[in-house]
Amino acid sequence: MRVKEQLLTLRAYVPGKNIEEVKREYGLSKIVKLASNENPFGCSARVTEALTSLASQYALYPDGHAFELRTQVAKHLGVKAEQLLFGSGLDEVIQMISRALLHEGTNVVMANPTFSQYHHHAVIEGAEVREVSLKDGIHDLDAMLQQVDDQTKIVWICNPNNPTGTYVEKQKLLSFLESVPKSALVIMDEAYYEYAGAEDYPQTLPLLEKYENLMVLRTFSKAYGLAAFRIGYAVGNTELIGQLEVARLPFNTSTVAQSVALAALEDQAFLQECVKKNEEGLHQYYAFCKEYNVFYYPSQTNFIFLKLGIPGNEAFERLMKKGYIVRSGAAFGIDDGIRITVGLKEENDEIIELLKELVNEQVQKEETYS
């Protein structure tokens, strides 16, 4: 029995190593995971409270339409409930969109590097993938526009971008939306939206009324700290969202996920405190990079991408042996970089000291050979 030919060219998604795996492999008792862009501050206390009230519902199917969560998210965003499509994390939302729109003979346009699942699901559906290299770490919208044609079904824009943490400015996005054919769906993946504080970061929801070929993706996995529960959503025009509902599994978001997302949404004070502490953490890394002349991309997310002057895989291994899990840039095609999730203040302090050691060792090597 053979699967689709295109599946033979792909690899299953490989997440960052988990804590127990690293403990076993390196014989360590303490592990700090800064690899998957999870919220180090956890989630709102209201989530724990919500969980205690769910025991009587475990044997029942969830609300397939996610009515209560849908109603409150719509109110929070200022959109219609019919504009929302919920999924088991944004991974499933991306899968649903790809399944509904793509087939052999169509194409998608995206940056490189960016979130890998856009490429993954396009290949599964038999679509051509047109990748455009980042320009100074940022989506090159002009070059991406040149790749769009009549067969382009989706243009993916990860904003802020994973893995670089950079963002597309408002005016550049508006210019792109004015120029791109209306037959191409422009999807703004805003998984890290809550962390983006730049003045010229585009607010896309108000643009949905003008641009019917625009769609916005957001998640509860990152700033809300609910990665374990898997819930994300798309916001778009009601007609397209209604059509995409056909591709959604009947009970794709659990009662537990819906309940905790609703609880987290209600605690905006906790969210804002997390965002504030994350900004402080980023500045810890900025100070290190400036003092040690380390290249980095200014970030609008809860992670930072930097280059230490050594291969990313080497930095990854050496940090892991010390109990710190990060992501090697090699996973994204940037062999000389690493991506580090912003952690608690003390975690940032500790790993920065290790980064200093790596940089100093490299400087000494270069001086020896010069």
UniProtKB/Swiss-Prot annotation:
Which Pfam family would be a valid example here? Aminotran_1_2
Modification N6-(pyridoxal phosphate)lysine occurs at: K222
User: Which superkingdom heads the taxonomic lineage of this protein's source?
Assistant: Bacteria
Task: Return the SUPFAM superfamilies for the record.
Answer: PLP-dependent transferases (SSF53383)
Q: Could you confirm whether the keyword Manganese appears in this record?
A: no
Cofactor(s) listed: pyridoxal 5'-phosphate
Q: Which GO terms describe its molecular function?
A: histidinol-phosphate transaminase activity; pyridoxal phosphate binding
Supply the EC number(s): 2.6.1.9
User: Which processes are annotated in GO (biological process)?
Assistant: L-histidine biosynthetic process
Name the pathway it acts in.
Answer: Amino-acid biosynthesis; L-histidine biosynthesis; L-histidine from 5-phospho-alpha-D-ribose 1-diphosphate: step 7/9
Q: What is this protein called?
A: Histidinol-phosphate aminotransferase 1
* Organism, as annotated: Bacillus anthracis
* Taxonomic lineage from the root: Bacteria, Bacillati, Bacillota, Bacilli, Bacillales
Its encoding gene is what?
hisC1
